[in-house]
Amino acid sequence: LFDDVVARELKDEDRIVAKNKHWVAFVPYAARYPFEIHVAPVMPVADLAGLSPEQSDAFPEIALEVMRRLDGVFGIAMAYIATWHQAPVREGRDLLRLHWQITSVRRAPGKLKYLAGSESAMGAFIMDLKPEQSAGQLRDVVL
């Protein structure tokens, strides 16, 4: 499924924040936070150990660009949580693909995203911006 998501993001380009030859960073279609970004290898990889030397070498470039864009969108250092997602070790390795998820609770300068009842109780997140708008703001940051 995630392979299809990445392929669609590369095709549409509306939600892409940054990309290089080996990685793509995008605001997911069903983002839960205004500035949630997923960074994934362009070619499917199950886990960090499966990265090629070229993919490993290209990661810092896109990671730094994403962090600069997050900091630049409001002109302040953006607080964030970063998580690596990898495939299970033994069974089901085809069920998940490696990607790095960055989430910020900030939704505007001086404003945090607090979960409403529907979000915390039911997991039905309400967004302040469309993911395409968030991605556009991040792309517009002058580096």
Describe the function of each predicted region:
Residues 1-143:
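HIT superfamily nucleotide-processing domains
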